[in-house]
């Protein structure tokens, strides 16, 4: 049983790591996607302010700018700027070799370019004669980048283009058959397992952008970012929950619905796993409503705030988008309320559900004594505390802000920052993560002192840590 649980946990970590890598190529470039979405929503013939001149920006941005940014970011993730340059160069091959926006190709060629130039540099390290370093560096990047561009143009581009067209046709078929709402049966559990960024930015967004380029909008942008299912669950906790869960729910509602940080509601589901049915019911009903109203967005909304959704909503789609969010909220609230009111142990709160949650998640519980940290002791001198989450922008930023304020009030002059889990800095003394991500954090930075929390918004571990640092 223990062996099976360890295998399940290891598999989940691998899936999270792969998903984090996919979303890591998209997330840093969200600003560019939003810029393209705004220009599209405003200036295309069916936009709010039709303008033939400005509309000329739409095509080149989606064809060249966005894939090149993804390719550069993918290469940079492997081998810093040098990898990014080769990755972007190689991406140009798939762009020119295809007649559709090549996001999938960019997500392949960018990392491949970074990987190959990294391996080349490792092979020649220490073998280049003094004075020839710059020559070798520049020409090696140019030659490898050029060869990859040619290979991508003639080989990878057409193959990826065919795959992308097949996937797009499959999505259109699913939409035509009105089966798209069933996707949330898989999306909602995946979100709670911290695969939300991978699902949205690694899978749905590339397909949605291709669809939006043809039709001016895509319903795929609404599948994962819809705040309705999470809002309904948090409202149910606020009205029918007990203990810390009830007390923290109002603040979580603001952060989730207005701030767009969906990770805030995941612990509320994980502490009562049956509530995943409420999330699924809300997600399915919301997407069904979007389908009925033929609603869609012009670009990916990030974060998943109601403000971001409305900002990316094209003309004539506001009623459908708002209806989908409201229906999803109402349905998830109704289902969650039934489960919360009928629960036998109503006194269970969010700070006491850790052990049960981890058993259900298929991993050994190590949170009860996390600050004791059986494997390590807290460093004698702490200079930097880093909060880490999957993307490094949402829940970790929220937790870092809370702890930073507590540190200031306690008179402790310690740097508190946040980052993506795959970009943890080597000089971090203490790393704080959600307990479902701690295994990955320990693999990335084994020498640091690791703290697991169940809820970034309201964790007693912050006060315990401050007391330990005062000693």
From Swiss-Prot:
Gene3D superfamilies: 3.40.50.2300. Homodimer. It is a multi-pass membrane protein. InterPro entries: PTS_EIIB-like_sf (IPR036095), PTS_EIIB_2 (IPR013011), PTS_EIIB_2/3 (IPR003501), PTS_EIIB_mannitol (IPR029503), PTS_EIIC (IPR003352), PTS_EIIC_2 (IPR013014), PTS_IIC_mtl (IPR004718), Sugar_PTS (IPR050893). The gene is mtlA. The keyword Phosphoprotein applies. It catalyses: D-mannitol(out) + N(pros)-phospho-L-histidyl-[protein] = D-mannitol 1-phosphate(in) + L-histidyl-[protein]. The lineage of its organism: Bacteria, Bacillati, Bacillota, Bacilli, Bacillales. This is PTS system mannitol-specific EIICB component. GO terms for biological process: phosphoenolpyruvate-dependent sugar phosphotransferase system. The active site is at 389 (phosphocysteine intermediate). Residues 383-471 form the PTS EIIB type-2 domain. Optimum temperature is 85 degrees Celsius. The EIIC type-2 domain forms the PTS system translocation channel and contains the specific substrate-binding site. One of its GO terms (cellular component) is plasma membrane. Residues 1-29, 77-139, 192-278, 341-471 are cytoplasmic. The keyword Protein biosynthesis does not apply. Keywords: Cell membrane, Kinase, Membrane, Phosphoprotein, Phosphotransferase system, Sugar transport, Transferase, Transmembrane, Transmembrane helix, Transport. GO terms for molecular function: kinase activity; protein-N(PI)-phosphohistidine-mannitol phosphotransferase system transmembrane transporter activity; protein-phosphocysteine-sugar phosphotransferase activity. Residues 18-342 form the PTS EIIC type-2 domain. Residues 52-55, 162-170, 299-318 are extracellular. It is found in: Cell membrane. The modification Phosphocysteine is found at residue 389. It comes from the Bacteria. The phosphoenolpyruvate-dependent sugar phosphotransferase system (sugar PTS), a major carbohydrate active transport system, catalyzes the phosphorylation of incoming sugar substrates concomitantly with their translocation across the cell membrane. The enzyme II CmtAB PTS system is involved in D-mannitol transport.
């Amino acid at each position: 049983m223990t062996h099976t649980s360890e295998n399940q946990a290891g598999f989940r970590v691998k899936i999270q790591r792969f998903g984090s890598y996919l979303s890591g190529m998209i997330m840093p470039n969200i600003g560019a996607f939003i810029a393209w979405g705004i220009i599209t929503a405003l200036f295309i013939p069916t936009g709010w302010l039709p303008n033939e001149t400005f509309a000329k920006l739409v095509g080149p941005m989606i064809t060249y700018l966005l894939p090149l940014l993804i390719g550069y970011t993918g290469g940079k993730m492997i081998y810093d700027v040098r990898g990014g340059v080769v990755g972007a160069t190689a991406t140009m091959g798939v762009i020119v070799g295809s007649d559709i926006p090549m996001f999938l190709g960019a997500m392949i060629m960018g990392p491949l370019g970074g990987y190959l130039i990294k391996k080349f540099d490792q092979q020649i390290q220490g073998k280049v004669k003094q004075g020839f370093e710059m020559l070798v560096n520049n020409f090696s990047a140019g030659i490898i980048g050029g060869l990859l561009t040619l290979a991508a143009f003639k080989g990878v581009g057409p193959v990826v283009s065919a795959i992308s067209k097949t996937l797009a046709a499959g999505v259109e078929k699913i939409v035509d058959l009105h089966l798209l709402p069933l996707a949330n049966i898989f999306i909602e559990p995946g979100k709670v397992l911290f695969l939300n960024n991978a699902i949205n930015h690694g899978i749905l967004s590339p397909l949605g952008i291709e669809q939006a380029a043809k039709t001016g909008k895509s319903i795929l942008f609404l599948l994962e970012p819809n705040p309705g299912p999470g809002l309904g669950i948090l409202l149910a906790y606020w009205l029918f929950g007990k203990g810390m869960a009830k007390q923290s729910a109002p603040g979580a509602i603001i952060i989730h619905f207005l701030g767009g940080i969906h990770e805030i509601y995941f612990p509320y589901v994980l502490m009562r796993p049956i509530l995943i049915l409420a999330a699924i019911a809300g997600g399915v009903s919301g997407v069904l409503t979007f389908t009925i109203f033929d609603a869609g967005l012009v670009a990916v909304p990030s974060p998943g705030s109601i403000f971001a959704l409305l900002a990316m909503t094209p003309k004539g789609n506001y009623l459908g988008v708002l209806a989908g969010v409201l229906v999803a909220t109402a349905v998830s609230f109704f289902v969650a309320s039934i489960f919360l009111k009928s629960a036998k142990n109503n006194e269970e709160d969010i700070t006491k559900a850790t052990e049960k949650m981890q058993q259900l998640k298929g991993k050994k519980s190590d949170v009860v004594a996390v600050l004791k940290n059986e494997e390590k002791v807290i460093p004698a001198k702490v200079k930097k505390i880093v909060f880490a989450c999957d993307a490094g922008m949402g829940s970790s930023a929220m937790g870092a802000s809370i702890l930073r304020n507590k540190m200031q009030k306690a008179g402790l002059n310690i740097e508190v920052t946040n980052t993506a889990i795959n970009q943890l800095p080597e000089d971090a003394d203490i790393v704080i993560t959600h307990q479902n991500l701690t295994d990955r954090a320990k693999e990335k930075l084994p020498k640091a002192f690791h703290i697991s929390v169940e809820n970034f918004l309201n964790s007693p571990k912050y006060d315990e840590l401050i007391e330990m640092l005062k000693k």
